[in-house]
Amino acid sequence: GKIVDIDTPADLFRQLVDKHFDGDLDSVVHLYYKNLLRMVELGGFDIVGHADKMHYNASCYRPGLLDEPWYDALVRKYFTAIAEYGYIVEINTKSYHDLGTFYPNKRYFSFLKELGIRVQVNSDAHYPERINNGRAEALAALKKAGFTSVAEWHNGKWEEREIE
């Protein structure tokens, strides 16, 4: 098969799904999570980022995808695999002020806590002026979900830093 970049704005995502997958969103979502599970198995990294950005991209097809049980089951299976391998999950805040969402969506924060997954908060470095976008809100949401600390890179290693 060919590589199709789906980390795009929703309108371009729709065009790519229509062109390369005949508009079959369900197949794209299942293939996406299948490949993410394979990535987790192969490893070679510390952090898993943009853990459920698919819900945003796919919103151009089905705005309620995040609420569909089959989608939720895929995301939970993915997080369970992440927990088994001991990776850190990035809580990405870049789009919080524009779109009102984190990646992963905050509805999964309690599940991450339940699984014992460590989390790390960042906003990407694509836009330096957005480096702290949504950080305070993400930390507050994590605290509400039961987290007391987040992972941060200091002096060449991951350390837990208390959420104040």
Language-model features and meaning:
Residues 1-85:
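Extended substrate/RNA-proximal surfaces in nucleic-acid metabolism proteins
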Residues 5-6, 61-164:
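Charged catalytic cores and adjacent phosphate/nucleic-acid-binding surfaces used
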